[in-house]
Amino acid sequence: MDGKTVVIFLLLFLYGTEVMANIYNNPGNILLGENFAGETGKYYTGKKTGLRYSVFDSPEMGIRALYQDIRSKLRRSKGDVEDAMLRYLGGDNDKDSKKDRYKKASTHNEDVEGYIQRAIKAYEEEGEDGLVKQIIKNENKAEAQRYYLDNPQSITTGKKLAIMDLPSGTSFENAVKVYQQGEYGRKHGGRVMNDPNKNYNAQ
């Protein structure tokens, strides 16, 4: 039994076959067509929204995309978490009143006010890390939450990889190589952790 098979069996043991069948490595439900690195070209359709969301090649690349997306929206919103979250949830037309933006955000999301208030509190307590974790909680069912949040190394790695701008076709494997071989590791908190069952050929 090779290393990859061992990992699959471990994931199935921890999370069950039904959960693993619905893991798309997209903890933030990033829409198809955003062209983030790590996208596989495949997608899944939201049962309630009917929208198409990207499948990523690893949880790390999905988390990287979430960090990049949130950082972009926070910059555009000048640090206003409420405004950034409205953009994240689809109420991104600056010409609309705040009431209309909430209404648009509610088109494909439940309890938008509660969602945003939890996000604001998480950001106040833990900054962008808390915000990302809260989004993962809001966007996923309990079992899928565990898949991401019970693996802090994936979150740490995704965050580190998020400092790099990468072409949309870049895989997790190649993203790790770019990070390891450049100046990123020394400037931004050390090397990213490799999966011992994969060969990244990175020194």
Language model features with spans:
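Hydrophobic alpha-helical topogenic segments used for membrane insertion/localization
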Residues: 6-16
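Positively charged n-region of N-terminal signal peptides that target proteins for export
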Residues: 1-5
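Cell-wall polysaccharide-cleaving catalytic domain and substrate-binding groove, primarily
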Residues: 15-202
